């Protein structure tokens, strides 16, 4: 499935290359600290020292967030529950609510987090390699995109951690949607912190 997801993502990026309109990414790096600040005093209720850990991550991402990469229309939410398969072949992608104009490599960063960890914490290089190979057969990454995959993946994991953290404290008890534990993203971020280049992701 990962190879199919990579190829579909590349096709989506190529198809949108001539789309003339733009939409701001309202959940990019500049939005993360304002999202977190009202939750600072409550974060430690989930884990001791959690607020300070998040603050340190945000400081790193704010200093190191890439600029100048190829941009276009991105989905930004390519999780398995938004992708459909029939007989092993990708048949559809839904939920373009967060689609926007931003770095194309962001979608790959999302997919690395959403598709390439087993048991919620163990990174699967084979899956990542298939994902990136499927993508690059149609749209090869340039050197800057490859080099920034670790920080992009780290940042997108933090984005989802923060939205989960917000929902954890603001979802009504009788809501139909189920809260997702923000702590589940911590091992993913720790993995990306340990990566210094794109080689561990299986980039060829």
Q: What is the role of each PLM region?
A:
Residues 59-106, 204:
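Active-site acidic catalytic loop and adjacent metal/ATP-binding pocket
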Residues 141-153:
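All-alpha amphipathic helical-bundle segments outside canonical DNA-binding/catalytic cores
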Residues 4, 8, 53, 107, ...:
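Charged catalytic carboxylate motif
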